């Protein structure tokens, strides 16, 4: 029998302290908790494992273009609930919810600006808005951006991230695949460059249209890129899928992606490509 007994230490009663929202982020790559400020300063790349997290469209544009040169276009376009879609929440309610959380009216920010001295038309998709699905507004804004680049005879840059076509708009969303692709075909006929940047994830209707039509296709490291998901493909083909299937690295090895570029080096790489295109025109 013990002579001395160590008293049990009990935690002080009270409510569990909660970490204020938006102060820290848990990295999907390594599981480490990273301060939000540190992530923002590092272009949303995890400083622990180099995982490329989703980057808001405005932040992406600021990291690519020369300071104070971006001019936004078609900022007032917004989607309409033409199908009067009903579900757990109406389409109108969902649009309102994502507008409040992101400050955007839809899933893409478009405009024109200067990148290292080169005039460009640019469209950047924001996965934070309804998984950056492509509806009538997204397709229209991207098409207008391409047409602006064609008219102004400058390069077009599209940074894609998407879960595909927007089911809330039915056939109207699928029509955007043909519309954006047609605009790019006319842009190409004018011998003008189009650079496509694929980020995590880029899938379905977006990948099956404008995202895969770049003169140069760049992907961020370890991005998921494909049409249907691995589970759907496996169930359809009844075959085991290759290791690293639908990753940027796998697609680069098989010639579907031209290069993989770290986010911090993306501006310099695009500038190099633009200088090449300018020299060959």
For the regions a language model picked out, list residue spans one by one.
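Long, charge-rich boundary regions
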Residues: 55-132
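Residues immediately within or flanking Cys/His clusters that coordinate Zn2+
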Residues: 24, 43
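Cleft-lining beta-strand/loop regions that shape enzyme active-site pockets
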Residues: 106-188, 195
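Conserved catalytic cores of soluble enzyme domains
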Residues: 162-281
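N-terminal alpha-helical interaction blocks
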Residues: 1-15
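Cys/His-rich microdomains that often coordinate metals
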Residues: 33-34, 52-53
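Short cysteine-rich clusters marking metal-coordination/redox-active sites
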Residues: 27-30, 46-49
């Amino acid at each position: 029998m013990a002579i001395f007994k160590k008293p049990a230490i009990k935690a002080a009663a009270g409510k569990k302290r909660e970490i204020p929202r938006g102060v820290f982020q848990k990295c999907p790559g390594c599981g480490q908790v990273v301060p939000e400020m540190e992530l923002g300063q590092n272009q949303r790349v995890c400083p622990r494992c180099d995982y490329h997290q989703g980057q808001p469209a405005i932040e992406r544009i600021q990291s690519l273009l020369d300071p104070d040169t971006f001019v936004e276009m078609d900022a007032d376009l917004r989607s309409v609930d033409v199908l009067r879609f009903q579900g757990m929440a109406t389409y109108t309610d969902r649009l309102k919810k994502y507008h409040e959380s992101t400050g955007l009216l839809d899933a893409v920010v478009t405009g024109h600006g200067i990148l290292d001295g080169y005039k460009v038309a640019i469209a950047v998709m924001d996965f934070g808005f309804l998984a950056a699905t492509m509806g009538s507004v997204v397709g229209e804004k991207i098409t207008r951006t391409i047409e602006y680049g064609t008219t102004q005879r400058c390069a077009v840059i599209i940074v894609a991230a998407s879960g595909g076509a927007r089911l809330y708009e039915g056939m109207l969303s699928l029509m955007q695949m043909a519309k954006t692709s047609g605009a790019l075909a006319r842009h190409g006929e004018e011998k003008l460059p189009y650079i496509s940047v694929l980020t995590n994830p880029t899938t379905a209707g977006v990948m099956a249209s404008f995202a895969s039509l770049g003169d140069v296709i760049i992907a961020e490291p370890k991005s998921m890129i494909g049409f249907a998901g691995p589970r759907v493909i496996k169930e359809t083909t009844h075959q085991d899928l290759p290791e690293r299937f639908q990753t940027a690295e796998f697609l680069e090895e098989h010639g579907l992606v031209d290069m993989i570029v770290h986010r911090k080096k993306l501006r310099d790489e695009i500038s190099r490509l633009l200088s090449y295109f300018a020299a060959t025109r």
